[in-house]
Amino acid sequence: ALLNWNDVTPHSIDHKAPSRGQVIPALIDSRSLSDLHAVFDVSNFKGMMPFRLVGVFPSEQEIWEWRWDSKQLGFQAHMWESRHWFSSSLSDDRAESLRGAACRSAQHESFAGSVPWLRRLHASHAGGPGPFSLCVHRKDVKTLSYSEIMVTAGNVQMGHFRGSPCTMAQIDPIEIERADCLDPAVWGISTAAS
């Protein structure tokens, strides 16, 4: 997950510099934590606005968070447990505090961790609809969509809903077999030599 890091004052930023949106495509082929570290060694984030990148590595049972403050890249390893990360252009710290409290409270519900629970959590207006509820509603900004990816030993399923999660009626996911995920033809990519 790539999050804007708004509570850090960026060092001199070149507005023609690369977008943070280029981070994920550069890392997408990484299959392990060591692969990711190798890519970071050659990546150039110079000029990019601050960001946080969270990587979850099931085979290593590790969760890592990298933080680029627009000058240097730091990292932190987290315990292998359920966690949430939040970002807000108003205040990352306040978003973490208020949204985090809603998540910790919901964690005690009997069906915590299930897909219906996760959808309801993301549609939550705990503390009232506003800038720091999980489903954001501000005068100038709102949550625009909700996506979920479910990975099992044999399949990858992705669903997406356009609109605020609190208005979500249903998601019609697509599913592919994991073996097909590595097949370029599945994605419409030609491997024939030109």
Report residues per predicted region.
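N-terminal nucleophile
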Residues: 1-194
